[in-house]
């Protein structure tokens, strides 16, 4: 498929991004909360489980990057992850407030969401 290179690159970047954040929140959650001056939750599992989910989604993005046309049916699940995170962060950001540590990731996820949507539409056309 033409123009598939940017889609592969996008999902390789998404893999690295989500897997890196997942590992960071599993192994270095205390350091991250301290760095951003945010009180950590009362148990590390509240942060480690979402970190593990980020690694799982990262692996899915890696699969999409390797075989975009064949794996395009997975993209909506990645989009839903981005919608879920953005919806929660932006809702709190614009209503009652949220610590600044969460905001850059919401902006990045919004960009990923839009690009995933464009990639999905292109890949669906290629499969048709």
Predicted features, each with a name:
Residues 26, 62, 90, 114-120:
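Membrane-embedded alpha-helical segments of multi-pass transporters/permeases
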Residues 8-18, 51-54, 75, 79-82, ...:
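Residues within membrane-spanning alpha-helices of integral membrane proteins
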Residues 66, 87-104, 121:
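Membrane-helix boundary connector in multi-pass membrane proteins
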Residues 19-24, 42-65, 77-84:
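Core segments of alpha-helical transmembrane spans in multipass integral membrane proteins
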Residues 13, 111-128:
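Membrane-water interface at the C-terminal end of transmembrane alpha helices
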Residues 59-72, 93-94:
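Juxtamembrane helix-break-helix junctions at the cytosolic face
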Residues 34-45, 73-74, 98-108:
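Non-cytosolic membrane-interface motifs at loop->transmembrane helix junctions
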Residues 4-45:
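Membrane-helix boundary elements
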């Amino acid at each position: 498929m033409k123009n598939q290179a940017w889609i592969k690159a996008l999902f390789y970047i998404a893999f690295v991004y989500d897997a890196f954040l997942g590992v960071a929140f599993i192994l270095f959650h205390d350091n991250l909360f301290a760095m951003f001056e945010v009180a950590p939750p009362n148990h590390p599992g509240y942060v480690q489980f979402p970190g593990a989910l980020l690694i799982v989604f990262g692996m899915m993005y890696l699969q999409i990057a390797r075989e975009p046309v064949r794996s395009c049916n997975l993209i909506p699940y990645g989009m839903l992850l981005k919608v879920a995170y953005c919806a929660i962060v932006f809702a709190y950001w614009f209503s009652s407030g949220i610590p600044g540590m969460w905001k850059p990731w919401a902006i990045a996820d919004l960009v990923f969401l839009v690009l995933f949507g464009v990639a999905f539409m292109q890949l669906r056309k290629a499969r048709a």
